Every structure is written in structure tokens, then in C-alpha cells.
């Protein structure tokens, strides 16, 4: 019953690891090559419709959300940290993102901090951000929604959660 799977496209990009977000002029700063995985949707026409950036430090959770999104015919880029997601978004290395789905609790920068940075950015503020968490903490959920999160999903994320979100965001 499984359709022919398309292998995710792997790319490597160079990003700045300097502590200043957005850079400035100059140069300087350390740079490193980082892997980015873009999983294509099954239908060619669907690929251009919806592109989701999935951010989670758990490789299992990244794989689950990517599989659910691909089964719904969306293109998915996965990254393992909010810091990496923000770098790629600010550098324009993940073009045409229609939605960001991020875990709340990650080392370094949390999903909540990513949400705040996205909403403060004139370039990125229109991108809907959805927060996911395995912890049902009402104050945390309220705080994320007040900061502009499109939704807050409890893990494990189900295909029906993704369908509901994507139909609202198109």
C-alpha cells in the first residue's frame, strides 16, 4: 500500500555562528556548514503550495511530523534547533516558508523564544508559528498564544491536527 517514497533532498549550507543575529556589515564571525533536510511531497504541484519548517531537537519527533506533513502533500524542511531555524530563515536559505512548527522545549533557544523572534522580525512576522509540546501547561500555552502563536499542539501530533492547521493557513 505504500507509495514509492521519494528520498529527502539533503543540502549543506554555510551559516554564521557569530552571536549577532542578522549580521551587519563586515564579515568576521565564525562560519560552519550545516546539514538541512528538505523532504518533498508526493505530488509536484503540492510542493509549491505549502512549505513547512519543522523544528525539534528530537530526531524521532522531527521524523514523525515530517511524515505527517508529507502524507498531507506538503514540502518539509527539518532542523534540530530554534537557533538553526532562525539562522536559515534570516539568511533566506529556506525560501517560501508558509508555516513553522516548533517544539517548545529545546536546548539553547526554546520554541517560545523562536516565536518571539519571528514575530519581532519585519521579514518573518507574517509566517504562522505553531508550538508543540508533550507537556500540557496552561500558562505556557496561554503565553505562546498571546505572543502570536497560531496554535499550540500537544504531542503526539496527529494527522488531524496537521490537516486542521494547514486548512486554516493556506
UniProtKB/Swiss-Prot annotation:
Modification after translation: Two-component system major event consists of a His-to-Asp phosphorelay between a sensor histidine kinase (HK) and a response regulator (RR). In plants, the His-to-Asp phosphorelay involves an additional intermediate named Histidine-containing phosphotransfer protein (HPt). This multistep phosphorelay consists of a His-Asp-His-Asp sequential transfer of a phosphate group between first a His and an Asp of the HK protein, followed by the transfer to a conserved His of the HPt protein and finally the transfer to an Asp in the receiver domain of the RR protein.
CDD domains for this protein: REC_typeA_ARR
Induction or repression: By cytokinin and salt stress.
SUPFAM superfamilies, A to Z: CheY-like
Domain Response regulatory: 51-170
Top-level lineage group: Eukaryota
Pfam families: Response_reg
GO-annotated biological processes: cytokinin-activated signaling pathway; phosphorelay signal transduction system
Keywords attached to this entry: Cytokinin signaling pathway, Phosphoprotein, Transcription, Transcription regulation, Two-component regulatory system
InterPro entries assigned: ARR-like, CheY-like_superfamily, Sig_transdc_resp-reg_receiver
Tissue expression profile of the protein: Expressed in mature leaves and flowers, and at low levels in roots and shoots.
Modified residue annotations for 4-aspartylphosphate: 103
Family under the similarity heading: Belongs to the ARR family. Type-A subfamily.
Protein function: Functions as a response regulator involved in His-to-Asp phosphorelay signal transduction system. Phosphorylation of the Asp residue in the receiver domain activates the ability of the protein to promote the transcription of target genes. Type-A response regulators seem to act as negative regulators of the cytokinin signaling.
Name listed for the protein in its UniProt record: Two-component response regulator ORR6
Organism: Oryza sativa subsp. indica (Rice)
Amino acid at each position: 500500500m505504500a507509495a514509492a517514497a521519494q528520498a529527502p533532498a539533503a543540502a549543506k549550507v554555510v551559516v554564521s555562528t557569530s552571536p549577532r543575529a542578522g549580521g551587519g556589515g563586515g564579515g568576521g564571525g565564525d562560519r560552519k556548514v550545516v546539514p538541512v533536510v528538505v523532504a518533498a511531497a508526493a505530488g509536484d504541484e503540492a510542493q509549491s503550495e505549502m512549505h513547512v519548517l519543522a523544528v525539534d531537537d528530537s530526531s524521532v519527533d522531527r521524523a514523525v511530523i515530517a511524515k505527517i506533513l508529507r502524507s498531507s502533500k506538503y514540502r518539509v524542511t527539518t532542523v534540530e534547533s530554534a537557533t538553526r531555524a532562525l539562522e536559515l530563515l534570516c539568511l533566506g536559505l529556506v525560501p517560501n516558508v508558509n508555516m513553522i512548527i516548533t517544539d517548545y522545549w529545546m536546548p539553547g533557544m526554546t520554541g517560545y523564544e523562536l516565536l518571539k523572534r519571528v514575530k519581532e522580525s519585519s521579514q518573518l512576522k507574517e509566517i504562522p508559528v505553531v508550538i508543540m509540546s508533550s507537556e500540557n501547561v496552561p500558562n505556557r500555552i496561554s503565553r505562546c498564544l498571546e505572543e502570536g502563536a497560531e496554535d499550540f499542539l500537544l504531542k503526539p501530533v496527529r494527522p488531524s491536527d496537521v490537516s486542521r492547521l494547514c486548512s486554516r493557513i493556506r
